[in-house]
């Protein structure tokens, strides 16, 4: 060891942890499942039962027992009443009143004239009853008598009648107008193909002969008063522009 030469400050020492390059097997790279607890327990090992403590369940009422609010009678057993006779004391009923026979003063024979003797009818106006609005008595308009006109009479002879219904648009001429052929629908064959054909004539447009189509001037196109070449005319003078004194004259022939 004393003769070894080391470069730098590095010296051989014990590693602090396992080095994967020193093992041919997976080694500590894979962790085995534990044998404690309930989650991720080793399936090849025996596991004891695990228990958990849940929350207290909700109660609808604070007191579930009947308590002293219920007074159970002494004659009530587990199967119901014991069947002993029970008696109660009621009040005294009222005495039945005796029948009172009416005397002579209880009758009014003077009021029996209309019922015992013949009398003229009398009428009175009473007030409207409360059930008048709910009266369901049918009136004359509630009845419908059978008609004596028409074919629906059983005991009457009626002439035949007819009715006109509307035309349906499905499968009718309203749906397809081609189903109603008009005069233009048929193709009429020319009668000249199977009969003697008379001579036929046609009218063409008028033919115009070729000629000079230039516009010829009329009498109004000329101005004879402006012609001065065929008559003597006095001399005419006009005013020209003033030339500048500083303009050089035009010299055409230059002397050598």
UniProtKB/Swiss-Prot annotation:
Cystine crosslinks: none
User: Which keywords describe this protein according to UniProt?
Assistant: Cell projection, Cilium, Cytoplasm, Cytoskeleton, Flagellum, Repeat
- Where is this gene product found? Cytoplasm; Cytoplasm, Cytoskeleton, Flagellum axoneme
**STPGR repeat extents:** 66-92, 181-206, 217-242
**Taxonomic superkingdom:** Eukaryota
Recorded GO cellular component terms are: cytoplasm; cytoskeleton; motile cilium
Q: Name one Pfam family in it.
A: SHIPPO-rpt
Other notes: 'Shippo' is a Japanese word for tail.
Q: Which family does it belong to?
A: Belongs to the CIMAP family.
General function of this protein:
Outer dense fibers are filamentous structures located on the outside of the axoneme in the midpiece and principal piece of the mammalian sperm tail. May help to maintain the passive elastic structures and elastic recoil of the sperm tail.
What is this protein identified as? Ciliary microtubule associated protein 1A
Task: State which gene encodes it.
Answer: cimap1a
């Amino acid at each position: 060891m004393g003769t070894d030469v080391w470069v730098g400050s590095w010296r051989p020492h014990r590693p602090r942890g396992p080095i994967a390059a020193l093992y041919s097997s997976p080694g500590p790279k894979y962790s085995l499942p534990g044998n404690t607890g309930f989650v991720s327990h080793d399936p090849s090992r025996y596991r004891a039962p695990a228990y958990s403590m849940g929350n207290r369940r909700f109660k609808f009422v604070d007191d579930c027992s009947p308590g002293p609010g219920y007074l159970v009678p002494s004659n009530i057993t587990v199967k119901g009443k014991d069947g002993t006779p029970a008696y109660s004391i009621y009040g005294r009923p009222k005495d039945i009143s005796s029948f009172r026979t009416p005397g002579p003063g209880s009758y009014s024979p003077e009021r029996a004239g209309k019922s015992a003797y013949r009398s003229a009818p009398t009428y009175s106006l009473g007030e409207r009853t409360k059930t008048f609005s709910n009266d369901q008595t049918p009136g004359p308009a509630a009845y419908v008598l059978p008609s004596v006109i028409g074919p629906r009479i059983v005991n009457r002879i009626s002439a035949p009648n007819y009715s006109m219904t509307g035309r349906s648009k499905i499968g009718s001429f309203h749906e397809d107008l081609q189903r109603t052929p008009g005069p233009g629908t048929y193709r009429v064959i020319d009668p000249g193909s199977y009969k003697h054909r008379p001579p036929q004539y046609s009218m063409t447009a008028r033919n115009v002969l070729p000629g000079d189509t230039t516009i010829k001037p009329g009498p109004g196109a000329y101005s004879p008063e402006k012609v001065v070449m065929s008559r003597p005319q006095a001399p005419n003078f006009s005013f020209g522009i003033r030339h500048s004194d500083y303009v050089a004259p035009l010299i055409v022939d230059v002397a050598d």
